[in-house]
Regions:
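Juxtamembrane intracellular "pre-TM" segments in multi-pass secondary transporters
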Residues: 1-14, 193-219
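Hydrophobic core of transmembrane alpha-helices in multi-pass small-molecule transporters
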Residues: 25, 93, 105-127
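Helix-to-loop junctions at the C-terminal end of transmembrane segments
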Residues: 64-78, 166-167
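Cytoplasmic helix-loop-helix junction between adjacent transmembrane helices
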Residues: 115-150
Length: 219
């Protein structure tokens, strides 16, 4: 009961700091776990000559994805919703990569098609998580360094655990679905984070131009 009362007595700023630190920490822990796509592709015999093509397609998709999701975020006036959407779809689709058929004549083509589609949702995850964190820290005067350090710390911890425990015990394919599971708390915490005010749509005033023209200091 005492712990519950303490949590309820937290100021909105402190509560938001804890939420953002949780999002950053869990997000980067999940990213550390799911950082073995290239290792997996090599283990199944993905042609080395096609890695260059896959990377080229991934770069093109990254440029388009960032532009697309940035536009959508501006249109709907929400950064938080885009974070939730990209985390959910990016990780939800990523866990199915090990299920793509291997050893078939069409396997390479499937990877070249499906991985860029998955990356369309995965690439914006990190920029939008940082966007949400930076804006909320600025608007509510939170300590960004402390919030962001949780991500760096848990990234290192999760990386050590993955290399020394998860992969030896369950293999590289397990990193895909474990990443999805680890990311779930980050998605839930994001739902309860504040929506940055600067991310909301601002209704344009029809008299805006007239006001500027009458402002002699501006003219």
């Amino acid at each position: 009961m005492n712990k519950l009362r303490r949590l309820r007595s937290l100021s909105p700023e402190m509560a938001e700091t804890l939420r953002l630190a949780g999002v950053q920490g869990i997000f980067w822990a999940a990213m550390a776990v799911g950082n073995y796509q290239t290792v997996y592709l090599q283990s199944i015999g993905f042609p080395a000559t096609d890695f260059g093509l896959l990377n080229a397609i991934a770069c093109a998709v990254a440029i388009f994805a960032m532009t697309f999701w940035g536009t959508v975020s501006d249109r709907i006036g929400s950064v938080r919703k885009i974070v939730i959407l990209t985390l959910t779809l990016g990780c939800g689709l990523f866990i199915f990569v090990p299920l793509i058929p291997t050893g078939q004549s069409y396997s390479t083509l499937l990877f070249l098609i499906l991985i860029p589609i998955i990356n369309f949702f995965r690439v914006p995850m990190s920029p939008f998580v940082d966007n949400l964190t930076v804006r909320n820290c600025a608007e509510h005067r939170l300590n960004y360094g402390m919030v962001r350090s949780s991500g760096s710390l848990l990234f290192a911890v999760a990386g050590v655990i993955t290399v020394n425990a998860l992969i030896p015990a369950a293999g590289v394919p397990s990193t895909f679905w474990v990443m999805g599971i680890v990311m779930i708390p980050a998605i839930v915490l994001t739902y309860f984070c504040f929506e940055p005010q600067s991310g909301k749509r601002v209704k344009k005033s029809a008299a805006g131009a007239g006001v500027l023209l009458k402002n002699y200091a501006y003219m």
